[in-house]
């Protein structure tokens, strides 16, 4: 009898795990996805009713630094699938408040972090082509296009901060010089920064910067592939491919690397849908982390939606990741837990928890909104053509 009871217990436990697993892979409705995105977004908009107010932490920073710029990428993605004027007005007020300039350094800055806000400036220009919205970020990038230096992106986060800007300008102005410079900067990061580049062609993942390429290893002897860093890269590739013409130079390089990265992410996804902060070492501060996971869900869902990732495993992984974020990280009031604070490696901001806020609450939300926007499409949601049209080339002002 005892043996029979044990078998029943095992069967019940197995059935429970199966039910949990199926729930994790159950596609939410488009309406539920929008609802969760709205709640998360409203939390930040309530906290920052004036989007131009500086961020005050250990020092005062303008509100168009990279952390907030990443949020606005997500907000514009939300606007695409849930076109409320409140979102558009909030973004325009932000851009106008910063005079449509980079965060620091004016048009002379080559720092990708300073330039990241330009992604949203350009998207707002594409909705309403007022020249002031694009002039300064274009002048900033034009200086880099006309320079012979290609080593500006020495950390992989930079790829997401700046690559889409070059791609957007190349598409708007139909000028391949932006695509060529984009490739030169990207390829230097991939193959030359550090000892042999920051990309491992065997594992199809990236070291965050030269401090983490071999011989550096995690405490358990593994390569340290930081989750959010790789999330930045996957997001960069998706956002570049999203606007690049099919015949743009070097497009195939980005497609190949995107697919290789996506394939590498599948076997290391956690059962709860998240990815560990150290992708190859679950013992190095292992646990749920929202920002990297959000970027991965965005990339995977985007790849499925655009026909680059055709195997069912990618769709399942995206659903599993999104459900993990919503079920385990999103609070009823819109706060997102398990967001790792700013940094460059798995140990930064540890330990993480459901209730612990990151030092900046904006970029994690940006990842969540980007992910949700593609999950909305994956779930069968329809996007209004008038909003989709902002990706279409408009009459451009003066060329490069």
State where each predicted segment sits:
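CBM-like carbohydrate-recognition segments
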Residues: 27-69, 81-118, 124-128, 132-137, ...
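Residue-level detector of functionally pivotal "anchor" positions at catalytic/ligand-binding pockets or at interdomain
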Residues: 385-400
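Asp-box/WD-like beta-propeller blade repeats and closely related beta-sheet repeat scaffolds
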Residues: 133-166
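Bacterial N-terminal signal peptides that target proteins for export
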Residues: 1-11
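Extended ligand-binding clefts on enzyme/binding-domain cores
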Residues: 156-157, 167-279, 286-297, 309-343, ...
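Bacterial N-terminal signal peptides
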Residues: 10-19
């Amino acid at each position: 009898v005892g043996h029979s009871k044990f078998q029943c217990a095992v069967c019940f436990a197995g059935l429970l795990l199966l039910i949990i697993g199926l729930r994790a892979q159950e596609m939410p409705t488009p309406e539920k996805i929008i609802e969760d995105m709205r709640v998360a977004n409203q939390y930040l908009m309530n906290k920052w009713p004036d989007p131009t107010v500086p961020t005050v932490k250990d020092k005062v920073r303008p509100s168009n630094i990279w952390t907030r710029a990443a949020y606005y990428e997500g907000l514009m993605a939300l606007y695409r699938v849930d076109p409320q004027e409140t979102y558009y007005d909030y973004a325009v007020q932000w851009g106008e408040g910063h005079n449509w300039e980079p965060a620091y350094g004016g048009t002379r800055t080559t720092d990708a972090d300073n330039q990241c806000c330009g992604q949203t400036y350009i998207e707002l220009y594409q909705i309403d082509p007022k020249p002031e919205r694009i002039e300064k970020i274009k002048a900033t990038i034009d200086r880099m296009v006309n320079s012979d230096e290609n080593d500006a992106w020495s950390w992989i986060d930079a790829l997401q901060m700046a690559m889409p800007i070059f791609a957007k300008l190349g598409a708007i102005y139909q000028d391949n010089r932006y695509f060529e410079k984009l490739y030169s900067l990207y390829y230097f990061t991939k193959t030359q920064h550090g000892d042999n580049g920051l990309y491992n062609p065997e594992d199809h993942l990236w070291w965050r910067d030269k401090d983490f390429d071999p011989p550096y290893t995690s405490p358990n002897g593994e390569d340290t592939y930081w989750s959010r860093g790789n999330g930045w890269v996957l997001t960069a590739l998706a956002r570049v491919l999203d606007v690049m013409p099919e015949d743009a130079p070097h497009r195939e390089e980005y497609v190949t690397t995107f697919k290789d990265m996506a394939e590498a992410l599948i076997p290391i996804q956690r059962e709860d849908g998240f990815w560990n902060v150290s992708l190859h070492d679950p013992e190095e501060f292992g646990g749920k982390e929202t920002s990297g996971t959000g970027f991965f869900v965005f990339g995977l869902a985007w790849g499925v939606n655009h026909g680059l990732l055709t195997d069912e495993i990618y769709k399942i992984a995206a659903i599993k990741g999104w459900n993990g974020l919503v079920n385990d990280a999103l609070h009823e009031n819109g706060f997102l837990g398990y967001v790792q604070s700013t940094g460059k490696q798995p140990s930064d901001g540890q330990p993480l928890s459901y209730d612990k806020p990151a030092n900046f609450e904006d970029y994690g939300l940006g990842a969540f909104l980007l992910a949700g926007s593609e999950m909305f499409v994956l779930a069968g949601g329809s996007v209004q053509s008038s909003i989709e049209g902002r990706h279409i080339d408009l009459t451009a002002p003066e060329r490069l």
